[in-house]
């Protein structure tokens, strides 16, 4: 069953990319063609907040729809990068898969499996090493809303 679901997800994913490319084509939708990474940021944020609201409300139907909307915006950003010759969505997907494996040695590394008693600290150490950050706070996005930023700083400080 898992393999069938993965195949269907891949088919649906490819279809969505083709729909997006058709919308961006010269004979596609004028609105979609004129969008830039920057012009889409407000919509990206809005979709993210709509997902949060659906989760907090326990509204599964809306969550399903909003996850689709956010997926569109992620693919839209990747399509803009592809059009500019910067990278392909496959590069982003490969990168996140590799990163998850690196940051979960307790799951994927048979020699070191389940050796880390503090998984959060292990994650942060791996992240700091990969990103070559000066300190743990370097990775807290400056654009986060103030309360979210304060929470992330507190979480990171608690691991020191």
Where in the sequence are the language-model features?
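Flexible "arm" and connector segments at domain edges
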Residues: 1-66, 72-160
């Amino acid at each position: 069953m898992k393999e069938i679901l993965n195949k269907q997800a891949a088919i649906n994913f490819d279809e969505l990319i083709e729909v997006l490319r058709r919308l961006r084509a010269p004979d596609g939708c004028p609105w979609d063609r004129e969008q830039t990474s920057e012009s889409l940021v407000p919509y990206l944020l809005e979709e993210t907040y709509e997902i949060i609201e659906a989760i907090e409300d326990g509204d599964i139907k809306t969550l399903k729809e909003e996850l689709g909307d956010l997926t569109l915006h992620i693919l839209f950003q990747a399509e803009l990068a592809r059009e500019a010759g910067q990278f392909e969505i496959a590069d982003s997907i490969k990168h996140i898969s590799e990163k998850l494996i690196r940051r979960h040695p307790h799951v994927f590394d048979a020699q070191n499996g389940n050796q880390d008693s503090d998984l959060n600290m292990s994650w942060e150490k791996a992240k700091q090493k990969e990103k070559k950050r000066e300190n743990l706070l370097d990775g807290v996005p400056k654009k986060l809303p103030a309360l979210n930023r304060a929470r992330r700083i507190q979480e990171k400080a608690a691991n020191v």
